[in-house]
Amino acid sequence: MQVTETLNEGLKRGYNIVVSAAELDAKVNEKLVEAQPEIEMKGFRKGKVPMALLKKQFGQRLLGEAMQETIDGAMNKHFEDSGDRPALQPEVKMTNEDWKEGDDVEVAMSYEALPAIPEVDMSDIALEKLVVKADDAAIDEALGNLAETAQDFKARRKGSKAKDGDQVVMDFVGKVDGEAFEGGSAEDYPLVLGSNSFIPGFEEQLVGVKAEEEKDVTVTFPEEYGAEHLAGKEAVFTCTIKEVKEPVAAEIDDELAKKFGAEDLAALKSQIAERLEAEYAGASRAVMKRGLLDALDAKVSFDLPPSLVDAEAKQIAHQLWHEENPEVHDHNHGEIEATEEHTKLAERRVRLGLLLAELGQKAEVEVTDAEMTQAILGQARQYPGQERQFFEFVQKNPQMQQQLRAPIFEDKVVDHIVAQAKVTEKEISKDDLQKALEALDAE
């Protein structure tokens, strides 16, 4: 076997690989010898079929396998000897297309190598950790929000008109073209005006109604309505108003606490404080992580594989286009060109991705089975009733596993770096933390 370098520019590599006919023949014979003990053929005992006959019968079939294995072996040996790591799957092409049995096999292999990653002294990285305490005002605000969610309704004075936010208890019958339709009627139905729980335009027409009043509400079902026989059609709902009720906030006391699973109000406040501080810590970590990535990005410089940058830039452009065009759910659109800004962001992401991968490998950072299981379960909760199917899907899908593993690995590498960096704490207000978070999104 002969390997000759044809290209070595930056990270681009090219090689010609020649596998001699004799090597191929030896590989075929090797595979025949391996299979011989199990082969049965009429006129011969099992395992006693002559090699010449086996080669005549199976040689042609094994030649393709032998060729692929020999080329794969040559590539693996090249990467082992050179230390190169291809950024993407190498491009391999047979150059003697008129090849016939008995000829040498000539193959051209090209790829982009991953760059050498420079050493990073993490002890001189300075980071700021923002600390926010859950003060009484924040706890009281959270309690007030809980009280609103636990609000009740009490009947308004007789003759009062319904306002936005009121609850209207009613019977209604819906008709399309004068005919009642299935699912279009109900009795004693409590509807909170402004909740947007009914189709657009329905609740607005009930603002101002009184108890014991009857009102016809005319609406048009959305074109994308779930029930196809109603989509886009006009309907008239005859509503008989039984009660108009105003919202009453729940009292902030031990009874409210018990509704949310706490023993008393003091215990609920303690739970809220813990939850708030966990939220603040998560936000603070996001800000510090950005600071760390900025510091690393400024600290290192190395060549980047153009193919990785190009793929990442296209992915960024595609994602941003869909965010700006949320009504398009499929990929049935023209090609989205990556801009210079997309490419600049892609270079940063690729550079940091390669650096973190290298640092994680050197630190022997691993994602445990328990961490993967937790991540899969977290994703599975988005598909109620289909958790088992989702779990099985992930187990059979290496690409999905990698999508779940990557952010866990990155966070563990970040923790590893932070543990060695110089970290100073700075206590700030909740509002200042929010501003720091918003600044991340604005960048």
Swiss-Prot record:
Record has Isomerase as a keyword: yes
InterPro entries for this protein: PPIase_dom_sf, PPIase_FKBP_dom, Trig_fac, Trigger_fac_C, Trigger_fac_C_sf, Trigger_fac_ribosome-bd_bac, Trigger_fac_ribosome-bd_sf, Trigger_fact/SurA_dom_sf
Gene Ontology CC: cytoplasm
Signal peptide range in chain numbering: none
EC category name: isomerase
Record domain PPIase FKBP-type: where: 165-250
SUPFAM superfamilies the UniProt entry points to: FKBP-like, Triger factor/SurA peptide-binding domain-like, Trigger factor ribosome-binding domain
GO molecular function: peptidyl-prolyl cis-trans isomerase activity
GO biological process, one term: protein transport
Key word Chaperone present: yes
Keywords on record: Cell cycle, Cell division, Chaperone, Cytoplasm, Isomerase, Rotamase
Primary location: cytoplasm
Subcellular location as annotated: Cytoplasm
Record field: catalytic activity: [protein]-peptidylproline (omega=180) = [protein]-peptidylproline (omega=0)
EC number: 5.2.1.8
Domain description: Consists of 3 domains; the N-terminus binds the ribosome, the middle domain has PPIase activity, while the C-terminus has intrinsic chaperone activity on its own.
Family assignment from sequence similarity: Belongs to the FKBP-type PPIase family. Tig subfamily.
Function: Involved in protein export. Acts as a chaperone by maintaining the newly synthesized protein in an open conformation. Functions as a peptidyl-prolyl cis-trans isomerase.
Name of the featured protein: Trigger factor
Naturally occurring in which organism (per UniProt): Ruegeria pomeroyi (strain ATCC 700808 / DSM 15171 / DSS-3)
Lineage of source species: Bacteria, Pseudomonadati, Pseudomonadota, Alphaproteobacteria, Rhodobacterales
Gene that encodes it: tig
